[in-house]
From Swiss-Prot:
Alphabetized UniProt keyword annotations: Amidation, Neuropeptide, Secreted
Main location: secreted
Domain of life: Eukaryota
Organism: Panagrellus redivivus (Microworm)
Keyword Transferase: no
Name used for this protein in its record: FMRFamide-like neuropeptide PF2
Any one GO BP annotation for this protein: neuropeptide signaling pathway
Subcellular localization(s) per the UniProt record: Secreted
Function according to Swiss-Prot or TrEMBL: Myoactive.
Tissue-by-tissue expression: Nerve cords and paired groups of cells located caudally to the base of the pharynx.
Family, as annotated: Belongs to the FARP (FMRFamide related peptide) family.
Residues modified to Phenylalanine amide: 9
Keyword Cell cycle (UniProt): no
Amino acid sequence: SADPNFLRF
C-alpha cells in the first residue's frame, strides 16, 4: 500500500 507519508518527500 502506498503511504502518503512516503509521498511527503
